[in-house]
Amino acid sequence: CFPIKVSHGHVVDMLDKDIDYLFLPSVINMTHASSKVTHSYACPYVQCLPYIIRSAIDLDSQKFKVLQPIIHFEYGESFLDKNLRQIAREAGCRGRRVETAIKMAKETQESFYEQLETRGKDVLDKLGEEDFALVIISRPYNGCDSGVNLDLPEKLRDLGVLAIPMDFLTLDLEDISKDYPNMYWKYGQKILAAARVIARDKRLYALYITNFGCGPDSFISKFFPKEVGGKPFLMIDIDEHSADAGIMTRCEAFLDSLKNARIKEF
């Protein structure tokens, strides 16, 4: 898929830079949003990213050291801390400095999540009853990378449309485990939870960014229309051949059709 191709480009870009370490983790799974969820896996490409990269790029002959840990977020705090200490040892760090760094990292990450929800609540509170916004449904490496998503949120803003990331929504309050007990993709859980939030709020509509060849999305996208409550949404597949003109044409057409849909709703 396109993000994996981009990751190869990022690594190639590092080859000529004066770096000491290249952090290239194998992330197997993520934290659970609910105790009722059995697993929260990353996609197979994310899990095996360092091995895919090594099959295409000679990293052993480089001057820098590759840090290639296997990360299991769902195994709990103590297991994760053990992983992090091992990474630190490979980078030449030990003792109190490492423990302080782990503590600060967790606090900073938690603070960031809280800021996202606070900012999201603030944005939605200011959105009028007859206003609307597009929620960017995506994985973070699509929705948060302006190079990968062709700066789509900013382009929507130029069209006078507010675009917000799905992480602005309080997704942890949505329990999809009853209807999808075997939804073991972490972002599948988040995407379907976001769809339910959108379905309940008449001001929100979805713009789903995916990639050609995305295995998990080929399944998740089949359930999305049902969970979004039958509301119109736009799905855009992006790869290295995508261009501004085609994307903008689809967005403009969707916004035009949305006007008619909203007239019927109101």
Label each PLM-derived region with a short phrase:
Residues 1-266:
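An N-terminal assembly and electron-transfer interface module characteristic of large anaerobic redox
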